[in-house]
Amino acid sequence: MPPRILLSLTLLLSACAQPLPPLPADLVRVALDSGTRADMRAYRLDGELVRQLRFPDLPPGTHELQVRYQFEVPGGMGGLGQLSEPRRRTCILGIEGELSAGEHYRVTAYRLGWQPVGYLEDAAGERLVRASVIRCGPGV
């Protein structure tokens, strides 16, 4: 591989691996955790579309967070009695909660059958608010 391409690739990959800067004491950080075989992305913050994968650091107060959660569900019976491949299901989950300055929070989600279950947790992992399912299906 030519050195220029190798250097460019190294710089590109190292930019993705940068740790987040320390959280200022007057802001709130919300991380996303979807576990394995699933994907969670920031969708809306206080009604406004988020154009990043995660939420920006927020001022303290009450916020409405929405995430797009995509997870695998088992396939059904295909033709000739064979099991079909697992399918991806996409849902929008909403959480409204009071966030305190200087704190780290995490939105977690998992699937329970065909339905998602999500929570807002504090830094210690204590569940604070259960997420509501806003909608699921194609085009979400």
Would you name each region that the model predicts?
Residues 16-140:
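Short loop/turn and low-complexity linker motifs enriched in small/turn-promoting residues
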Residues 1-17:
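Sec-dependent bacterial lipoprotein signal peptides
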